[in-house]
Amino acid sequence: MSVLVNKDSKIIVQGFTGSEGTFHASQMIDYGTNVVGGVTPGKGGQEHLGKPVFNTVDEAVQKAGADTSIIFVPPAFAADAIMEAAEAGIKVIICITEGIPTADMVKVKAYIDQLDCTLVGPNCPGVITPEEAKVGIMPGFIFKKGKVGIVSKSGTLTYEAADQVVKQGYGITTAIGIGGDPIIGTTTKEAVELLMNDDETEAIVMIGEIGGNLEAEAARWIKADGNRKPVVGFIAGQTAPAGRTMGHAGAIVGGADDTAQAKMKILAENGVHVVESPAKIGEMVAKVLA
């Protein structure tokens, strides 16, 4: 069983004919992902990358049976694109776009919380279930099928963790890049919970960073849930100065609990196997699965 996306997912690309959408959609198709079409308003009826183009998400749902969407739409229009997908009945919405105004995301979050759908992102690398579906911008060749789930705020650290896990002789069930913005659809805790409840996932790598309380919330849930599966944790930003945004919009130390040190302490107190360097992730996974 996989989480969020699999070989049966029927995926559409919003912003399909733009340069980003075109490049990444073609990579997804080459990977073997079941892309059933795309959406670009005003270009409906055309064909692009051998797939149909629709004017609206609703049309893509009606005609192609789409149930999953990936969004490559400019920041000013991305919030509307997310809400359009949700309203059309798309079940899994993955938004890659970086730079969506926070005020827009407040509205999006309130809207999608009323509907039966899952938003991953924005400002994320996407989701991959190796050898089944790559719905994102990650380099697919790094990921091999296996039994370790990954939840990460960082795109590049997701790839690094996957590479190490694979080199240790294990593989990945599903990797979820949740994104680094202050307001995101799927939280660390929610993503970890999905993997905890996945039969094929035997261990989880959880990668966080400074800013916010998502990792602490996840760690407390992991303990309350009975530490059913081993979780390896890493927090990026251990040398970050307070009050300065570091890379991601959400990566800013506001209070004492936002620091990497404070988060690592909370993780360890709740039974997470914390590593101090990303270079140690693979070794720790091998240790907890031995």
What kind of region is each of these model predictions?
Residues M1-A290:
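Catalytic-core regions of core metabolic enzymes
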